[in-house]
Amino acid sequence: MSFVVIIPARYASTRLPGKPLVDINGKPMIVHVLERARESGADRIIVATDHEDVARAVEAAGGEVCMTRADHQSGTERLAEVVEKCAFSDDTVIVNVQGDEPMIPATIIRQVADNLAQRQVGMATLAVPIHNAEEAFNPNAVKVVLDAEGYALYFSRATIPWDRDRFAEGLETVGDNFLRHLGIYGYRAGFIRRYVNWQPSPLEHIEMLEQLRVLWYGEKIHVAVAQEVPGTGVDTPEDLERVRAEMR
């Protein structure tokens, strides 16, 4: 099955300036992500960046780069610029792998591409079970609830579904109904072209979750449980030190 991986790698980061180029055990982080993507069997891998230093690091590792504007409001908008510059056909399957996920398993990159290819929807993503209350109540862990066919009903930073009886009793354990969304997406190129022409939705602004725009406009997102749980992503200096230790 043919698919393309696009890795958005924005240079500016409030909490970790120059994030794509931070060193992890002798390599820039973006090169680690590129290597994981290569292991997925993708037909083509493109790093989308707004900074020449990132481009040079990727090219030195034998990777392909697409230079993009620096003013994009989201990773999906950056993807859309690449889709147009590369003139991908509308049915091309594209997987968006975040540039700050150096420990992402190649298996789940392939999984999200396969899931999308098997369904007549524009978008697919993955989730993992939540087993502890700390994560269930953490607003930085995005929760998702699904219908009987595995399509997203809603994504939220709130604790959904709300387990009325268990939480009313003050229990610190959670049941088997909680899923944490992973920030990996598969799209068809034609869907990306439509997405960027939609106005942002009120729910998207409230939750600060751009995938809610898709549900707002009546489109479906398929969500599968990931075959492997990815390692730590890098958002903060503390995350970076943790990843360095785990990858040592």
Swiss-Prot record:
Its main location: cytoplasm. InterPro entries: Cytidylyl_trans, KdsB, Nucleotide-diphossugar_trans. GO terms for cellular component: cytosol. It is found in: Cytoplasm. Pathway: Nucleotide-sugar biosynthesis; CMP-3-deoxy-D-manno-octulosonate biosynthesis; CMP-3-deoxy-D-manno-octulosonate from 3-deoxy-D-manno-octulosonate and CTP: step 1/1; Bacterial outer membrane biogenesis; lipopolysaccharide biosynthesis. One of its GO terms (molecular function) is 3-deoxy-manno-octulosonate cytidylyltransferase activity. Keywords: Cytoplasm, Lipopolysaccharide biosynthesis, Nucleotidyltransferase, Transferase. It is an enzyme of class 2 (transferase). It holds the Pfam family CTP_transf_3. Activates KDO (a required 8-carbon sugar) for incorporation into bacterial lipopolysaccharide in Gram-negative bacteria. This is 3-deoxy-manno-octulosonate cytidylyltransferase. The gene is kdsB.
